[in-house]
Amino acid sequence: MATRLLRGSLRLWGGLCAPRLPTASRCSHSGGEERLESPSAKKLTDIGIRRIFSSEHDIFRESVRKFFQEEVIPHHAEWEKAGEVSRELWEKAGKQGLLGINIAERHGGIGGDLYSAAIVWEEQAYSNCTGPGFSLHSDIVMPYIANYGSEEQIKHFIPQMTAGKCIGAIAMTEPGAGSDLQGVRTNAKKDGSDWILNGSKVFITNGWLSDVVIVVAVTNREARSPAHGISLFLVENGMKGFVKGRKLHKIGLKAQDTAELFFEDVRLPASALLGEENKGFYYLMQELPQERLLIAELAVSASEFMFEETRNYVKQRKAFGKTVAHIQTVQHKLAELKTHICVTRAFVDSCLQLHETKRLESAAASMAKYWASELQNSVAYDCVQLHGGWGYMWEYPIARAYVDARVQPIYGGTNEIMKELIAREIVHDK
């Protein structure tokens, strides 16, 4: 069993002994090591490639890959039927040190760098197992608490979330408000020092298993604009009036619990307010670039997985007396796919480097999300086609990857909204 890396100790996993995770101050790139980039690598999913990583990252990646191979892949089909992963998996991930990686140690996180967090994103994509909501929990929900929470909130939630004993979700989307966050109708009204929360949310990842949910709510309808009247609240499972409606049945991400949530006169103490009153929209705008970068990373990594899966298939599948890989049209398609994926990988890695040093702008994150998620769907379509009829069979990994890809251009802000944000930056007079 793994012992989680803490303050100078060693990480143990399956006999593998690794130093503590790299931090931005210690090691955030290859440091002069000779490393192949994706176009020159034997496989796009190889360990030890790409200059943004170091040998320390490689050791960590080996342990993460082993975790997904041993603890996730064997059970994922079962979780797809259940519509959720087991809580036991969350605690195993916590013990392995896969949660809260990029959250500071002083807050109760692991204290690793962004690249270490990205390794978990990538390895989950390479496993083709979309059920565990680790990335949303660790790299979307936890940063809100770490960045805007009070000392009391941080101490209460972050250590338990890092251990996998408290599962986090964030509730933005409503039946009538998706990409338009200013259209939120869920509201919280003051009642003495408390707040009374009413409304509903939908399409909430980790919603069914969640122990704490960050809820976006209107707190000032008289504000000069909707953006100036939104606040964030920490709502805990079991609070009176907080009801989880049902797990939603999706065409993809079948093992990922996605729920609708209802709030009927939920009484929240003043301590449930996250950050300052009416500053919620500002906090959302600050954190959305990381969410969009995460989606881009998952998208290009899934594309790398699909390419390798398809390359292996066409080299084995025979037609017209030879393997499909020897048909020129197939070779040309593989050449196109690898080129598009490698170009996108270079851009997304560049965005990771910018974000590690807090220099990733919203427009660039929007470009990465838009481009990589479109690529993922294009790659999925072509890879299914190269599999022929077998690509349409659920037992083939490419079929799962195909349906899982479709939501990527939708959540985190639709790609149409991404283009609006990119265009706004282009035409804006600075």
UniProtKB/Swiss-Prot annotation:
Substrate binds at residues 179, 227-228, 282, 289-292, 412-413. GO terms for molecular function: flavin adenine dinucleotide binding; long-chain fatty acyl-CoA dehydrogenase activity. Keywords: Acetylation, FAD, Fatty acid metabolism, Flavoprotein, Lipid metabolism, Mitochondrion, Oxidoreductase, Phosphoprotein, Transit peptide. The keyword Flavoprotein applies. The keyword Transcription regulation does not apply. Acetylation at Lys-318 and Lys-322 in proximity of the cofactor-binding sites strongly reduces catalytic activity. These sites are deacetylated by SIRT3. It comes from the Eukaryota. FAD binds at residues 170-179, 203-205, 317, 328, 385-389, 414-416. SUPFAM superfamilies: Acyl-CoA dehydrogenase C-terminal domain-like, Acyl-CoA dehydrogenase NM domain-like. It is found in: Mitochondrion matrix. This is Long-chain specific acyl-CoA dehydrogenase, mitochondrial.
